[in-house]
From Swiss-Prot:
UniProt function note: Pyrophosphatase that catalyzes the hydrolysis of nucleoside triphosphates to their monophosphate derivatives, with a high preference for the non-canonical purine nucleotides XTP (xanthosine triphosphate), dITP (deoxyinosine triphosphate) and ITP. Seems to function as a house-cleaning enzyme that removes non-canonical purine nucleotides from the nucleotide pool, thus preventing their incorporation into DNA/RNA and avoiding chromosomal lesions.
Single Gene Ontology BP annotation: purine nucleoside triphosphate catabolic process
Protein name listed in UniProt: dITP/XTP pyrophosphatase
Family, as annotated: Belongs to the HAM1 NTPase family.
The EC number(s) this enzyme carries: 3.6.1.66
HAMAP family: Non_canon_purine_NTPase
Length: 202
């Protein structure tokens, strides 16, 4: 069975990838399976740069096909912040709750209709064969930032991200509902179309 390594230790993300790839008889591994590997520093200025950086570096270290995603929250009223700094918006160590608090605090006086935001996901796939360049797909999900947390599901900024088509926070959605509209779900569907060509050599 062919292996694909997903460059994350976030088990929520690993599950999303595993559900997709098992249909193609591809085995998904995560960074938990390679504890000796050091995390790649995300020094890129865009989600795409960071995703390619991670995928490429790990693909060479592991001699495997690696998928890396870089995703985050873009808030119009904050001039695009937290952006590529979404995971560490409130500083180190990474803390979802502190990040949410910081976004809410910075939007404190902003009216709901001006709290437009989107989740963005760039997915890069790198191959151990030196002649194959990394490939990339992306996805977005539009919404608004709520004034307080809602829901228990998901991770990251999901509790404060309001999805209009469901009239719910992302964290109130079932995993099926979330996958149908989420930035990562949309990027994964684009990736799915490419699996035969990119992973199975068809």
């Amino acid at each position: 069975m062919k292996q694909v390594v997903v460059a994350t230790k976030n088990m929520g993300k690993v599950r999303e990838f595993a559900e997709l790839f098992e249909r193609f008889d591809l085995e998904v591994k995560s960074l938990h399976d390679f504890p000796h590997i050091e995390e790649v520093e995300e020094t890129g200025e865009t989600f795409e740069e960071n995703a390619i950086l991670k995928a490429d570096s790990l693909s060479r270290q592991l001699n495997a096909i690696v998928i890396a995603d870089d995703s985050g929250l873009i808030v119009d009223a904050l001039n695009g912040k937290p952006g590529v700094y979404s995971a560490r918006f409130a500083g180190e160590p990474k803390d979802d709750q502190a990040n949410i608090d910081k976004v809410l605090q910075e939007l404190n006086e902003v009216a709901f209709e001006k709290r437009k935001a989107r989740f963005y996901c760039a997915l890069a796939v790198a191959f151990p064969e030196g002649d194959k360049k990394p490939v990339i797909v992306n996805g977005t999900c539009e919404g608004f930032i709520l004034e307080q947390r809602r829901g228990e599901n998901g991770f990251g900024y999901d509790p404060i991200f309001y999805v209009e088509e469901y009239k719910k926070a992302m964290a109130e959605l079932s995993s099926d509902e979330k996958n149908a509209i989420s930035h990562r779900g949309r990027a994964l569907r684009k990736l799915e179309e490419k699996i035969p060509e990119w992973f199975l050599g068809e």
